[in-house]
Amino acid sequence: MKKHLNFYITLWIVKLISAGLKLLGKNATYYPGKLALDMCPGFMGMLDKPKTIIGVTGTNGKTTVSNMINDILIDNGYKIINNKYGSNIDAGIATTLLQGATLFGKSKKEIAVLEIDERSAPKVFPYITPTYLICTNIFRDSLMRNAHTEFISEIVSKNVPKDTIVIENADDLICSGIAPNNAKIYFSI
């Protein structure tokens, strides 16, 4: 997406607010991204992304898996951006990308490891194409929120970008069936 003046104004305001929140001892994992998306709806699409993006989604284990991947990559010398505090909806992901960007929206990191809430796929994947998307599992979670496992798998399947390589839990039949037309790698426990 082409960057315009509103993008830069938004970027500078939310970077300033994010720095202020951190000075006050806050993690600033949600609000800066929420404000950025309110001020500039295409904000996530305009930010430059790291060359490699690893997304982690599923009902359980997203934070653990994304933090393990993050730690392994850091231990091997990579420059990483990660939403390690679990702010995994669109605003949290926008905040994470913002924190890894310069004042001109260029990425300062080589790799992004992003925990992505499965219900946020329609709001995230139009702007971010993960190189890899790991699906840990898909279980019936909160009935009020997720209704049924097939409902969740359909949301993820319909929104995974076609160029994303999907890494799926082969022990979970529902998880191993998402994004049927994408390249796949399977793992088992």
Report the location of each language-model feature:
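Short acidic loop-to-helix transition motifs that present clustered carboxylates
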Residues: S87-G92, I116-A121, F151, L173-I174
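Extended acidic/charged loop-beta regions that coordinate divalent cations
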Residues: A112-D141, I178-I189
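A conserved segment at the C-terminal end of the G1
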Residues: T52, V56, T64-K84
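General beta-strand structural signal in soluble alpha/beta enzymes
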Residues: I80-K84, L114, I167-N169, Y186-F187
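Conserved glycine(s) of the Walker
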Residues: G61
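Acidic, Mg2+-coordinating active-site environments of NTP-dependent enzymes
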Residues: K51, K108, F139-I189
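Short, basic phosphate-binding NTP loop
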Residues: M1-G55, D75-N76, A91-A101
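Loop/turn-to-beta-strand initiation segments
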Residues: G105-A112
